[in-house]
């Protein structure tokens, strides 16, 4: 799928990051937001990728040591570490893409 790999954080859960994929960043963030103060998610980074499911799978493999559950997209680690693992996981020709820092 042509789409985006994104990294989400939440101040209520410091030190945790979520790595996921979507076709539409803003729509995806809206699915997380509710009136609960614990649902204040922020998209920290996203990057467009022509095969985001394949790339996400590779990134999740690299992040396994930081996962608490096998099929979970949440990882206990530093945001900069995750960003580095995403960059490492891209094919060399894909690595020309850059992260876009957004507070969506």
PLM features per residue range, with description:
Residues 1-104:
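Non-catalytic accessory segments flanking enzymatic or RNA/DNA-binding domains
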